[in-house]
Amino acid sequence: MTIKLINIGFGNIISANRLISIVSPESAPIKRMIQDARDRGMLIDATYGRRTRAVVIMDSDHIILSAVQPETVAQRLSVKEEIMDEGQG
């Protein structure tokens, strides 16, 4: 199994293998998830004080806040997978 890393902004990198979902922080259920993670000590704020634009949900129950749009993070993941596929094929 190859370890894939994704840049989520400002030099912060996460493991793509542990990623479950990338969502927008606007909905009430996501806001509740963020608050719950904060209360449990499972919230990682990688926004550097900027507005939260993406919420990354990891398989370890960690919630990561990013200042990068969800589409941008998803595109970085797609590009990374294409590069990996070309290298193998």
From Swiss-Prot:
The family this protein is said to belong to? Belongs to the RemA family.
Instruction: Report the protein name in the record.
Output: Putative regulatory protein BLi01788/BL02292
The cross-references to PANTHER family, in alphabetical order and at most eight, read:
REGULATORY PROTEIN SSL2874-RELATED, REGULATORY PROTEIN TM_1690-RELATED
Among InterPro entries, the record links this protein to: RemA-like
